C-alpha cells in the first residue's frame, strides 16, 4: 500500500472516530439532562415530594459540561478538517501540536468528569453507612438506571478519545521522523565520495 494511501486511510479513520465521539458525548449529555424523577416519600404523617435531576449534584453538572465541551471540540475539528481535504489540521507542526495537546486535555477532563459521576452514582446506589445516608435508588430507580447508562457512554467516549490521542500523537511525531529522514539524506549527499 502506498504511503499516501495509508495517510488518507488514517485521516478518514480519525475523522470517523471523532464523529463517533461527538455522537456518543451528545448521547451521554442528552441522557443526563433529560434524566429526572419526582418521588413522593412518606415522612411521619405527611408526604414530601422530592425531585432528583442532574443539577442536584455538581459532579453531574461537571459531566454535562465536559460532554458538551468534548462534543463541540470534536465537531469543530471534524468540520474544519472536512474543509481542509480530510487532513485534521496537520499541515504544520503547530497545528499538529495544538490537536495533540487539546486531545490529551479534553480526554483527561472527560475522564475526571466520568469518574466523579461514577462516585456519585455509587453513593446514590449504595448509600454511605458512616454518614447515615441511605440508598436513593430504591426511590429513584429510573434516575439511577439512566445515570448509569449516561456514565457508561461517557466512558465509551473516553476510550474513543484515548484512541484519538494515540492517532494524533502518531501523526505529530511522524512529522519529526520525516524531518529527520530529510536531514539524514542531506547529510549523506554532502559527504565526500572519497569515504566510499
From Swiss-Prot:
GO cellular component, one term: plasma membrane
Residue intervals annotated with topology Extracellular: 33-58, 117-148
Bilayer topology: Multi-pass membrane protein
Annotated InterPro entries: CASP/CASPL (IPR006459), CASP_dom (IPR006702)
KW Transmembrane (keyword) present: yes
Cystine crosslinks: none
Positions on the Cytoplasmic side per record topology: 1-11, 80-95, 170-196
Keyword Magnesium belongs to the record: no
Keyword tags: Cell membrane, Membrane, Transmembrane, Transmembrane helix
Subcellular location per the Swiss-Prot or TrEMBL entry: Cell membrane
Pfam families for this protein: CASP_dom
Membrane-spanning parts: 12-32, 59-79, 96-116, 149-169
Record's subunit section: Homodimer and heterodimers.
Family as reported in the entry's similarity comment: Belongs to the Casparian strip membrane proteins (CASP) family.
Listed PANTHER family: CASP-LIKE PROTEIN 2C1-RELATED, CASP-LIKE PROTEIN 4A4
Name of this chain's protein: CASP-like protein 2U1
Species this protein is from: Pteridium aquilinum subsp. aquilinum
Lineage: Eukaryota, Viridiplantae, Streptophyta, Embryophyta, Tracheophyta
Amino acid at each position: 500500500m502506498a504511503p499516501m494511501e495509508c495517510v488518507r486511510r488514517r485521516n478518514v479513520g480519525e475523522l470517523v472516530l471523532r464523529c463517533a465521539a461527538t455522537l456518543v458525548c451528545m448521547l451521554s449529555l442528552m441522557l443526563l439532562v433529560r434524566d429526572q424523577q419526582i418521588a413522593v416519600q412518606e415522612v411521619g404523617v405527611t408526604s414530601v415530594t422530592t425531585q432528583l435531576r442532574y443539577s442536584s449534584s455538581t459532579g453531574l453538572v461537571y459531566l454535562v459540561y465536559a460532554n458538551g465541551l468534548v462534543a463541540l471540540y470534536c465537531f469543530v475539528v471534524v468540520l474544519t478538517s472536512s474543509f481542509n481535504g480530510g487532513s485534521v489540521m496537520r499541515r504544520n507542526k503547530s497545528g499538529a501540536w495544538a490537536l495533540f495537546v487539546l486531545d490529551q486535555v479534553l480526554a483527561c477532563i472527560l475522564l475526571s468528569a466520568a469518574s466523579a459521576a461514577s462516585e456519585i452514582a455509587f453513593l446514590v446506589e449504595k448509600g454511605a453507612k458512616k454518614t447515615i445516608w441511605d440508598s436513593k435508588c430504591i426511590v429513584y430507580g429510573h434516575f439511577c438506571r439512566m445515570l448509569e447508562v449516561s456514565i457508561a457512554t461517557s466512558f465509551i467516549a473516553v476510550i474513543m478519545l484515548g484512541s484519538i490521542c494515540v492517532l494524533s500523537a502518531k501523526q505529530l511525531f511522524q512529522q519529526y521522523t520525516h524531518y529527520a529522514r530529510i536531514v539524514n539524506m542531506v547529510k549523506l549527499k554532502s559527504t565526500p565520495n572519497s569515504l566510499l
